[in-house]
């Protein structure tokens, strides 16, 4: 009897050890496959840190060959464009870690791939003493022009190649100088102006009237409104519950159709359309254009904050349709909205890294343009684009016009609970051999037509110099 009990205990122990060994094997497989890249990139990984100390970090280069970040002869990281390019390059510090392309392309800049990192000490023998160069889609000249156009005002600018998704410029103000990031870290991290916040992809703002092209697309696509329908704008729309939506400066537009309402940015018309659409169609509109989704890749964009569809009253439906209520979006996503209409209804996934090149000049990785979403039909995209052409031709955005170039757009003046309205302008132009889409926000800038549209003109002129 005693022998039988002993054998049973041994059997149980053996089974337990067998299961434990199996679980350990599964975990090791997981670590060496699915979780390998995060482990290799973890700043606490001593092996990666040791390799980093021995490697001459590669350069970050724009689409024309201009150096945006490099390692000097003293081993210190240098950023020739300083705060102009900080929202793109980010920084790389011994004590504070890294951000931007410096963080996202850390492995490439070190020439230390995750596969080599898994080789352990052997990787030290195979590793070159200089990392790879990372080439971006950014145009330093356009970036500088956009930075200068903001004239030191808080805000953000995004410029995209609508046909590929390549980011041409990404500006955020206030900014910081990555050359001095470690010595100024405490002051920067505590500053009320939030210079470390990349407003282009992390800043959330009410879009104001720049959202109206999306609303028009949904209204026409679903048959909720036709081009022949007219609205009698009295300058003030009662939406129930004691709420009233007014047009800018108390303007009364009279009778107009949806095309004219885009050009004149009529709140009465779009508030009415919002209530006709209702929660489900409004939700569908924002879903089709990706406002409820994350993108991923090397453009780390904060997801939009959408109203709680399904629980909105008529007032919030109307407010959402004019870009207010609880709706908050990033400048990057508004540039993608403009790009959708410029690219026949297709939104390309935005990206910054064009290619990775070894010290010997061999391209070891390159980015191919990728479709992110098909948001609307080519016919509808062309129709909305024609409406936006009216904005710059004779509507609220004439200040964005550039002689000899077709510019389309939409202005926005977004109410802001903490101060003066934000000025917006989104749009696109066929310029410099490509279709460029853009979004501009000037915090507390007031009228989008008077403040943001002239910024668009300066950017288009810079693109035209290519």
Region locations from a protein language model:
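Periplasmic/cell-envelope proteins involved in peptidoglycan metabolism and beta-lactam response
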Residues: 1-185, 195, 204-209, 224, ...
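Beta-lactam-recognizing serine transpeptidase/beta-lactamase-like catalytic domain environment
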Residues: 7, 64, 163, 167-209, ...
